[in-house]
């Protein structure tokens, strides 16, 4: 058995185990075996191997619509819905308070995030943590942090349209389940993906927008700030608007 065949078999076993666990939670205790048709040597020889299939994008579990982040993560599984799975180490789902009032959405995992399986843990992640803790007086556990795509793009390139299309239903479902009061979109790509706009981030940032009925504030990505520290003051202005809005929501 080749390495790729072994990987496929392992993935199949994991998927089957998850399916059986779902069925058990639904009360299913046995599955009737369908009648197996007899295959003649002729049909066996003429049968061509089935082409590789792309997994169907769905936010429905076997029990129906998913109702928690845990179920959503379980449905994503060892995702192979786009080519990003070929080079990733971990699916980087998201982290934080499932009932957060504030949600940060970035572009996609980088090298550190891919290795750890957690968003924003590298140098850019430390800067975001400083914004949350030192600037806003919150903790990472108070907010929720996710990305537009859940797997690292090669060489940290921008995700391609088909990759975004594969991940977008899961991000939308995350937002539906968390239902934050405010979303902070970090960086050009996240902003344009969420707002479906090609307007430059320099014109969008600092102004309130709406996504799925939720207030959205675009601002620069922490990685951009590492390269352009002079623009930190602009992000701070954006964050102060977010803090003011959060205070009015709590009033």
Language-model regions, residue ranges each:
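A polyanion-binding, active-site-adjacent surface
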Residues: 10, 14, 18, 22, ...
């Amino acid at each position: 058995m080749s390495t790729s065949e072994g990987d496929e078999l392992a993935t199949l076993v994991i998927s089957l185990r998850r399916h059986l666990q779902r069925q058990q939670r639904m009360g299913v205790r046995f599955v009737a075996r369908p009648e197996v048709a007899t295959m003649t040597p002729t049909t066996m020889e003429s049968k061509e191997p089935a082409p590789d299939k792309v997994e169907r994008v769905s936010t429905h579990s076997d029990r129906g619509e998913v109702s928690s982040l845990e179920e959503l993560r379980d449905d994503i599984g060892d995702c192979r819905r786009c080519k990003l799975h070929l080079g990733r180490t971990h699916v980087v789902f998201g982290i934080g308070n499932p009932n957060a009032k504030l949600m940060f959405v970035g572009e996609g995992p980088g090298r550190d995030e891919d290795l750890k399986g957690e968003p924003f843990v590298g140098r850019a992640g430390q800067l975001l943590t400083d914004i949350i803790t030192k600037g806003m007086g919150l903790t990472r556990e108070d907010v929720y942090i996710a990305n537009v795509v859940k797997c690292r793009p090669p060489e940290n390139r921008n995700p391609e349209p088909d990759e975004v299309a594969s991940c977008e239903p899961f991000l939308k479902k995350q937002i539906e389940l968390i239902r934050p009061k405010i979303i902070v979109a970090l960086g050009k790509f996240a902003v344009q993906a969420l707002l479906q706009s090609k307007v430059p981030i320099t014109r969008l940032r600092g102004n309130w927008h709406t996504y799925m009925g939720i207030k959205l504030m675009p601002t620069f990505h922490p990685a951009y700030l590492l390269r352009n520290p002079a623009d930190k003051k602009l992000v701070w202005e954006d964050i102060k608007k977010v803090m003011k809005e959060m205070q009015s929501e709590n009033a």
